[in-house]
């Protein structure tokens, strides 16, 4: 009878775990005029990015500034990974990012795994996940070379205006670079380390979606999943086992395929299935950051393109570190 009562109470609580509808984008104080681009314009924007990056990585330091100015505005604003962080202007871009990268990896190649585009509010954007591969032959970011092949996981979002990129967000997984360079400096990952694989059942680069409703539906599915994360059973005084069951039966469940893969950055790792995601990352993360706000800042990017969607915050999360459950640090 007590077990039956527990199940009834559990189902009763689930009825009230409704996904709240709210704006997930950046909080803005000025009126802006939304832009919408056609599928053909979106395809051309993606080709513009692919072709120019292919030229830059092909020629490397040969005519570098000229090649960069074919795609980037001279006053480009760059938001980068630690320790490069934020800076402006094409000369800073060359000095801080491109020259050190090409010096350290003289044969570096770029392989796109996913590239998608769209518009969000008043911004036209193209985003990608790519792998930058090359022999590590000279120091990079203060790390001595190990003279081995390195695969850098790289995620980018570029804002395009007047046929030039005016702002870029570039995140290279530096912790994974350290791992491959034999410089592991943190606790072991809960998940599995290694490459992030390309899409399993579709081409993530050379696709063209004419039906804008499909792209919008892909984005809305992702945003609904994002909003579901604001439901926080860890705020209640419950056991770890009960929290696990609550997360497995959380409203997020409606948005994940049974064989889903969650690719986390190095230090966290990759997990398979919702149960694996809960065990390897979500449950310990929620216990460590029970006091957190996903939406105090909001997304600067929300785009859908065919089967794919892309959201991003800069920065994404404000939280209080409350326990060592997640990565084991006091």
Task: Please give the residue ranges for each predicted region.
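C-terminal and inter-domain tail/linker signature
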Residues: 1-330
């Amino acid at each position: 009878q007590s077990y039956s009562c527990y199940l009834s109470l559990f189902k009763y609580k689930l009825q009230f775990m409704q996904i709240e509808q709210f704006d997930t984008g950046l909080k803005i104080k000025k009126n802006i005029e939304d832009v919408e681009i056609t599928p053909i314009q979106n395809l051309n924007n993606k080709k513009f990015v692919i072709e120019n990056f292919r030229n830059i990585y092909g020629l490397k330091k040969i005519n570098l500034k000229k090649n960069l100015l074919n795609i980037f505005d001279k006053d480009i604003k760059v938001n980068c990974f630690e320790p490069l962080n934020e800076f402006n202007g094409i000369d800073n871009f060359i000095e801080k990012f491109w020259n050190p990268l090409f010096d350290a990896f003289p044969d570096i190649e770029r392989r796109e795994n996913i590239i998608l585009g769209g518009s969000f509010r008043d911004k036209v954007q193209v985003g990608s996940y790519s792998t930058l591969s090359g022999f590590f032959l000279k120091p990079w970011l203060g790390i001595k070379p190990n003279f081995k092949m390195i695969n850098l996981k790289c995620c980018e979002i570029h804002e395009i205006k007047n046929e030039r990129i005016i702002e870029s967000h570039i995140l290279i997984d530096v912790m994974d670079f350290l791992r491959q360079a034999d410089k592991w400096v943190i606790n072991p990952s809960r998940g599995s380390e290694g490459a992030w694989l390309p899409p399993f059942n579709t081409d993530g680069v050379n696709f063209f979606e004419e039906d804008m409703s499909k792209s919008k539906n892909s984005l809305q599915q992702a945003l609904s999943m994002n909003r579901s994360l604001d439901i926080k059973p860890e705020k209640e005084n419950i056991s770890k086992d009960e929290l696990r069951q609550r997360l497995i039966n959380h409203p997020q469940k409606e948005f994940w395929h049974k064989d889903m893969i969650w690719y986390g950055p190095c230090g966290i790792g990759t997990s398979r299935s919702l149960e694996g995601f809960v065990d390897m990352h979500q449950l310990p993360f929620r216990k460590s950051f029970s006091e957190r706000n996903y939406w105090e800042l909001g997304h600067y990017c929300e785009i859908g393109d065919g089967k794919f969607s892309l959201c991003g915050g800069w920065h994404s999360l404000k939280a209080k570190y409350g326990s060592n459950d997640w990565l084991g640090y006091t």
